[in-house]
């Protein structure tokens, strides 16, 4: 434990996702040893992000405008919507340069343990986006964990009542992974998603 404001800084940094006590302490001491100008700039950027960044009115992605750059891009295919849990998932998929459709960010996943149900997510907005018939395929790209699977199952059942093709991203063995370390579910999915090579 440190005295006063130093401990407060460590505690606040430790509240960030993925930052444990040791990382929080390292970051705090880095800040203490950094030039005042750089620390001030960091504080300004943090405040500016909170002021200027919002969520796209259409898809829920982060944006500095009412609609995000992806939803505004006329080169994107409006017949394809990829449903993800969080905006950071959009970034991950965009890095692949494989998907040229639009996105829909749910803002989380169904998690009864955490008290998150379908009404707490942007599912109603997704259904509204599908109403005009432009969308031909919805690709469900939720995380391959219990919450992501529950969300994918809920969405697939809900969307089968609409005139839209519903698909789920394949999951299976990671490139460079060893079979002996794969769990049964991952191996099972790898077999289900296998494709012909010759």
UniProtKB/Swiss-Prot annotation:
PROSITE patterns: RECR, TOPRIM
Keywords: DNA damage, DNA recombination, DNA repair, Metal-binding, Zinc, Zinc-finger
Pfam families, per the entry: RecR_C (PF21175), RecR_HhH (PF21176), RecR_ZnF (PF02132), Toprim_4 (PF13662)
Domain annotation Toprim: ranges: 79-174
A GO term, aspect molecular function: DNA binding
GO biological process: DNA recombination; DNA repair
Keyword Zinc assigned: yes
Zinc finger residue ranges, C4-type: 56-71
SUPFAM superfamilies according to UniProt: Recombination protein RecR (SSF111304)
HAMAP family: RecR
Protein family according to the UniProt entry: Belongs to the RecR family.
Protein purpose: May play a role in DNA repair. It seems to be involved in an RecBC-independent recombinational process of DNA repair. It may act with RecF and RecO.
Protein name (database record): Recombination protein RecR
Organism field: Leifsonia xyli subsp. xyli (strain CTCB07)
